[in-house]
UniProtKB/Swiss-Prot annotation:
GO terms for molecular function: DNA-binding transcription activator activity, RNA polymerase II-specific; RNA polymerase II cis-regulatory region sequence-specific DNA binding. One of its GO terms (biological process) is neuron differentiation. Disulfide bonds: none annotated. It comes from Alligator mississippiensis (American alligator). This is SRY-related protein AES2. The lineage of its organism: Eukaryota, Metazoa, Chordata, Craniata, Vertebrata. GO terms for cellular component: nucleus.
């Protein structure tokens, strides 16, 4: 069972698609670097929708898998 996505991953999922459409030949490592920089520059208020979605996913995950324990 996978862990639920955090706020960065929720936002990155959307942005990654946009970047891949604009630059289909860009390597995944470069896309990840750009996403990290964009996230760091994003204001706290702009992150709120992603934080809320991540929280919703976390709560759903807890309901779906009540005995889940993260084991790396």
């Amino acid at each position: 069972v996978k862990r639920p996505m955090n706020a960065f991953m929720v936002g990155s999922q959307i942005e990654r698609r946009k970047i891949m459409e604009q630059s289909p030949d860009m390597h995944n490592a470069e896309i990840s670097k750009r996403l990290g920089k964009r996230w760091k520059l994003l204001k706290g208020s702009d992150k709120i929708p992603f934080i809320r979605e991540a929280e919703r996913l976390r709560i759903k995950h807890m309901a779906d898998y009540p005995d889940y324990k993260y084991r790396p």
